Swiss-Prot record:
Residues 867-877 are annotated as: Required for interaction with IQSEC1. GO terms for cellular component: AMPA glutamate receptor complex; asymmetric synapse; axon; cell surface; dendrite; dendrite cytoplasm; dendrite membrane; dendritic shaft. Palmitoylated. Depalmitoylated upon L-glutamate stimulation. Cys-610 palmitoylation leads to Golgi retention and decreased cell surface expression. In contrast, Cys-836 palmitoylation does not affect cell surface expression but regulates stimulation-dependent endocytosis. Changing residue 875 to Y: Almost abolishes interaction with IQSEC1. Abolishes activation of ARF6 by IQSEC1. Residues 565-591, 611-616, 834-883 are cytoplasmic. The modification Phosphoserine is found at residues 683, 717, 860, 863, 880. Residues 22-543, 638-812 are extracellular. Pfam families: ANF_receptor, Lig_chan, Lig_chan-Glu_bd. This is Glutamate receptor 2. The gene is Gria2. Belongs to the glutamate-gated ion channel (TC 1.A.10.1) family. GRIA2 subfamily. It comes from Rattus norvegicus (Rat).
Length: 883
């Protein structure tokens, strides 16, 4: 059995005597307040003071209890009745309403309540809260809803739900009713998220929240968490305190939010009360000292006024009301009703006053009549009244001119919060940032862009760095947005000026301006070491296949020239001496032996010529076509030789995304939270899908938390890691020391960076126009040149570019020297062989010459010399062939 916390705030007779003056005309009033209703109790006390009169005083007896506990309610009610109270003010819920109404009807004790109206007729129950059914149905018809979800709290009763379902059956509405009253508090957040995700699958984007403030706030928190508070969603808060909830966090999301308001803050009576209410001490009056008041507290305050007015009217009518001593036992059998309870009930129902909740008047059943409920909508500049509902006029729309979503006139006195991210060269901390304050601490492309945007739009701004250091992505499980997108979605920032990629999923929850920069996903790798030229790099201008063909062509031409010279009679001639005498021999000679043919072809190929030339037409044809061939080959070789010898080349292991996907030696990854990762995750292109499969399953993880971490990983991986990032950032890092990264291949896609604002923000259109104007003025290009190239550290053209023209080094032409040295060495070797061979032959000849039997006296020295010359000449190919 739960123990009742009985507070005898029975303001003691001495204390109340000090407040109201000592008087015997004390009217005992009971009070049943639920735990946690601090503001309602403060409003009750303020009403007691405010409406006190010199004629009589209301003396309260207060009990704090769990209104859902029927036993506790019974015990408290009987305790109040035994004290001799004239009426009881209090709260109930679905579980205790029948207990209270039963006691009131049996004992004739009036019960004044701000709780939800009950169905049917309950004597002695005075309902301070107006019925919302008519206003809600009128609003549904006004918005022309024919399909929606209805979330209700069963603790508030089911009368409103029943009215909606009855109308749905009549008008063929599709209503999905969901009870959220029995959700476990420990798992409420998860349950709410799951609930709205299920509604999303059913395309339910129109929702009625028939709940009290605390539950509405809990639901709204989860709606924001999963991004269901954006354009395309519409919520109706079905209670009388539209402004009671925390609307600021959903104000800029873009969703339509409507509701009802019973307290009109434009009313002079309410304004005067708020002036006094806001000056009360919080310690003495918990929940006070605010510029607003909950509608349940306002109804509590009005209830005190109704009770005061009722007893005043009884005194004016000279109806004596008294309860002397103990009123008796409420559980007596049979029950003994209070004889004067009927008079008090009648007096209460006859009260007609103006209160914080407007005109207060009751019908014969104790229900409010002739009341007016304001219809509210949440705009970007706050809650706004669009009309009202009354029993007579029904719904009347009074707001004919809606505020423009492009209006920025209210920004002059507001400091716009600009969220951004530390990312070079967009936003960087200045070197002396510790000595600076505010926006002066930062520099970069986006810092300059923010200043220009603010200048064109005419607002003050404050730069803030996103807390988690992320751009913005939605968690697959919790559906929570992080990064800068999350700060916009959840109302922590007014605008995001950063390298934020425009994507579909982001566009669903925030608004983007026109792109201020175009880019695409690119590949960053560590710049490979310059390839050292080989010893025979002079052969590189022509492929090895061409060199082989040249060798075969050289041999083939030489052989053909040799054969042609043998068959053509015009290549044969008789040798003559210098004195004109012919040789005595009848044999003819041919200069194009096999060795001379090879020598002629080699001389022509080297463009150096030769001592001999073809005499016949056929030989000259062979020589001509060979000269033409060598002309083209040598010209092509010379043209390429300069580039190959003077340009240093870097051999990249990969050149495209296809190269990455086909290999496993080089790991590759993206930023862990951003549009690049989303691009690969959503891509249906085979190459990119294959890359995503690898990245998702790679161990260790190939994803990095920041771009700086990704660049550092590229630099430290010794060419074993490639980082996929936006091309603009890739180009910028390539310009920064130590100049050891490079962009390879083309862009994988095409996209743009945009300035983001919350859905429906008044800043959206103004920012968009500012971006277009800056683009037309060429300022965006100037800013990029300033931060990318003018401040580059690797020189123009990308620093140590892929190809750099420089002076020739020895390594470039070392092979030529090797061939020269080799040729000289070979020549010396051949000369030595020739010398040895000739010496041996000469020795044999001399030996024969010394033999007396072979001495020919008629031989002269001249004949010996000629023979020696001819023999030596024949070594190089001059031959006598007899045909």
């Amino acid at each position: 059995m739960q123990k009742i916390m009985h507070i005898s705030v029975l303001l003691s007779p001495v204390l109340w005597g000090l407040i109201f003056g000592v008087s015997s005309n004390s009217i005992q009033i009971g009070g049943l307040f639920p735990r946690g209703a601090d503001q309602e109790y403060s409003a009750f006390r303020v009403g007691m003071v405010q409406f006190s009169t010199s004629e009589f005083r209301l003396t309260p007896h207060i009990d704090n209890l769990e209104v859902a506990n029927s036993f506790a309610v019974t015990n408290a009610f009987c305790s109040q009745f035994s004290r001799g109270v004239y009426a009881i003010f209090g709260f109930y819920d679905k579980k205790s309403v029948n207990t209270i109404t039963s006691f009131c009807g049996t004992l004739h004790v009036s019960f004044i309540t701000p709780s939800f109206p009950t169905d049917g007729t309950h004597p002695f129950v005075i309902q301070m809260r107006p019925d919302l059914k008519g206003a809600l149905l009128s609003l549904i018809e006004y918005y022309q809803w024919d399909k929606f979800a209805y979330l209700y709290d069963s603790d508030r009763g089911l009368s409103t739900l029943q009215a909606v379902l009855d109308s749905a059956a009549e008008k063929k509405w599709q209503v999905t009713a969901i009870n959220v009253g029995n959700i476990n508090n420990d798992k409420k957040d998860e349950t709410y998220r799951s609930l709205f995700q299920d509604l999303e699958l059913k395309k339910e984007r129109r929702v009625i929240l028939d709940c009290e403030r605390d539950k509405v706030n809990d639901i709204v928190d989860q709606v924001i968490t999963i991004g269901k508070h954006v354009k395309g969603y519409h919520y109706i808060i079905a209670n009388l305190g539209f402004t009671d909830g925390d609307l600021l966090k959903i104000q800029f999301g873009g969703a339509n939010v409507s509701g009802f308001q019973i307290v009109d803050y434009d009313d002079s009576l309410v304004s005067k009360f708020i002036e006094r209410w806001s000056t009360l001490e919080e310690k003495e009056y918990p929940g006070a000292h605010t510029a607003t008041i909950k509608y349940t507290s306002a109804l509590t305050y009005d209830a005190v006024q109704v009770m005061t007015e009722a007893f005043r009217n009884l005194r004016k009518q000279r109806i004596e009301i008294s309860r002397r001593g103990n009123a008796g036992d409420c559980l007596a059998n049979p029950a003994v009703p209070w004889g004067q309870g009927v008079e008090i009930e009648r007096a209460l129902k006859q009260v007609q006053v103006e209160g914080l909740s407007g005109n207060i008047k009751f019908d014969q059943n104790g229900k409010r009549i002739n009341y007016t409920i304001n219809i509210m909508e949440l705009k970007t500049n706050g809650p706004r009244k669009i009309g009202y509902w009354s029993e007579v006029d029904k719904m009347v729309v009074t707001l004919t001119e809606l505020p423009s979503g492009n209006d920025t006139s209210g920004l002059e006195n507001k400091t716009v919060v600009v969220t951004t991210i530390l990312e070079s060269p967009y936003v960087m901390m200045k070197k002396n940032h510790e000595m600076l304050e505010g926006n002066e601490r930062y520099e970069g492309y986006c810092v300059d862009l923010a200043a220009e945007i603010a200048k064109h739009c005419g607002f003050k701004y404050k730069l803030t760095i996103v807390g988690d250091g992320k751009y913005g992505a939605r968690d697959a499980d919790t559906k929570i947005w992080n990064g800068m997108v999350g700060e916009l979605v959840y109302g922590k920032a007014d605008i995001a000026i950063a390298p934020l990629t425009i994507t579909l999923v982001r566009e669903e929850v925030i608004d983007f301006s026109k792109p201020f920069m175009s880019l695409g996903i690119s590949i960053m790798i560590k710049k490979p070491q310059k390839s050292k030229p080989g010893v025979f790099s002079f052969l590189d201008p022509l492929a090895y296949e061409i060199w082989m063909c040249i060798v075969f062509a050289y041999i083939g031409v030489s052989v053909v020239l040799f054969l042609v010279s043998r068959f053509s009679p015009y290549e044969w001639h008789t040798e003559e001496f210098e004195d004109g005498r012919e040789t005595q021999s009848s044999e003819s000679t041919n200069e194009f032996g096999i060795f001379n043919s090879l020598w002629f072809s080699l001389g022509a190929f080297m463009q150096q010529g030769c001592d001999i030339s073809p005499r016949s037409l056929s030989g000259r044809i062979v020589g001509g076509v060979w000269w033409f061939f060598t002309l083209i080959i040598i010209s092509s070789y010379t043209a390429n030789l300069a580039a190959f010898l003077t340009v240093e080349r870097m051999v990249s292991p990969i050149e495209s995304a296809e190269d990455l996907s086909k290999q496993t030696e080089i790991a590759y990854g993206t930023l862990d939270s951003g549009s690049t990762k989303e691009f690969f995750r959503r891509s249906k292109i085979a190459v990119f899908d294959k890359m995503w499969t690898y990245m998702r399953s790679a161990e260790p993880s190939v994803f990095v938390r920041t771009t700086a971490e990704g660049v550092a990983r590229v630099r430290k991986s010794k060419g074993k890691y490639a980082y996929l990032l936006e091309s603009t950032m890739n180009e910028y890092i390539e310009q920064r020391k130590p100049c050891d990264t490079m962009k390879v291949g083309g862009n994988l896609d095409s996209k743009g960076y945009g300035i983001a604002t919350p859905k429906g923000s008044s800043l959206g259109n103004a920012v968009n126009l500012a971006v277009l104007k800056l683009n037309e003025q060429g300022l965006l290009d100037k800013l990029k040149n300033k931060w990318w190239y003018d401040k580059g550290e690797c020189g123009s053209g990308g620093g140590d570019s892929k190809e750099k023209t420089s002076a020739l080094s020895l390594s470039n032409v070392a092979g030529v020297f090797y061939i020269l040295v080799g040729g000289l060495g070979l020549a010396m070797l051949v000369a030595l062989i020739e010398f040895c061979y000739k010496s041996r032959a000469e020795a044999k000849r001399m030996k024969v010459a010394k033999n007396p039997q072979n001495i020919n006296p008629s031989s002269s020295q001249n004949s010996q010399n000629f023979a020696t010359y001819k023999e030596g000449y024949n070594v190089y190919g001059i031959e006598s062939v007899k045909i």
